[in-house]
Amino acid sequence: MPQMTAAQALVRSLIREGIEVVFGLPGVQIMDVYDALYDEPGIRVITCRHEQSAAYMADGYSRSTGKIGAALVVPGPGIQNASAGIGTAYASSSSILVIAGQVESYNLNKDRGAVHEIVDQMDILKNVTKHRASIMTPPEVPAAVHEAMRQLKTGRP
């Protein structure tokens, strides 16, 4: 039996947690997630032309539907571009889940100049998020997604 990839586990976890729409911008580090989204008809994917738009679209979706909005962006400059929308959602107590890719594990925190590498991606978001997590292996995905959703539904998002 083939082993489930992290991308497949992520998409199935999002469906299980009730995510119906994902706003995002495809990129090399997250193409596996887009492939998994393509294979699962349970989530609608709306692509945009800038990561900031993805975050603002997730925010608007959350505010207009009362559901959690989800955005999918590339690491490094992608998550930094999304940070304005993330900060707006956080300041407004709007529930959005932002999923960012990451560079290859063998390049992580090595400062080698890998495409979209940022030494501490999570640190960039600490002042505009309630919860952040880093997932390194496929088995961690369901629990991490569940905890993120729990955080969004408990207290201030």
Language model regions located:
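N-terminal alpha/beta PP-like core and its mobile active-site loop of ThDP/TPP-dependent enzymes
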Residues: 1-157
